[in-house]
Amino acid sequence: MMEPFVSIIVPVYKVPEQYLRKCIESTMTQTLKKIEILLVDDGSPDQCGEICDEYAEKDKRIRVLHKKNGGLSSARNYGCKAAQGKWIMFVDGDDWIEPDMCQTMYSAGEEKQVQLVMCGIMKDYGKSATEYKFYLEDGKVYKGQECKWLQQQLLVYNGNIAVAYSKLIDRKLLLDNQIFHDEVLRQGAEGLEFNLRLFEKLESAIFINKPFYHYIYNENSISASHNEVNHEFVIKCFEKIKAFIDTSDNKEMLKP
């Protein structure tokens, strides 16, 4: 297969079958065909790995990466390092994306020559769904110092941009600056910590105000669980975030 335009990275660990199948099928039916789909089986003890292998038999664009369990951050990094596309997109294994997400975001990224494309998010609770409120201008290209303002917005969750998903990221930006998820931060605010480092190096971005990404609220998921281990990881995340802010080139804007 020729080098794909977009590499979709899907971490998979103990995802209920109906969610996992919908997630994978939503990536397979993208209108942008020149993609690769990396299903990262993070040592899931159930049938997730076999389900991933099943889909790989049906679609040559799918690669299944089986690895020892290391957590969400580890799985994302594993996929990112194996990716071959010009652009990286993270999709969690229990979420799904609209058919035109890759095409629309890829076209915007190429046309505007930016390093990051962001889109809207729909939060699905099962019987109801709510579109996240974003306070970014639709179609606006952010450059230079405006990207520093975006970095500041991560800390106030303005527009819910402090997540790894719902983004198309220039792979070269990640690799050149060695921007990977901190694998010590297995859960909690790991997306915020990752994005702070990403936006530190960011020179251009665009926001598309369409909810292409469907976040499925699963009360049994790692991120939704409230236990001592989860709280411990959250504390570690914010300790890392404080340390980052103290040494950031943009620390005056980031401090309260």
Outline where the language-model segments fall.
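Glycine-rich, basic loop-to-helix element that forms the pyrophosphate-binding segment
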Residues: 67-83
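Short alpha-helix within the catalytic core of nucleotide-sugar-dependent glycosyltransferases
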Residues: 21-25, 49-53, 77, 85, ...
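A conserved acidic beta->alpha catalytic loop
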Residues: 41-50
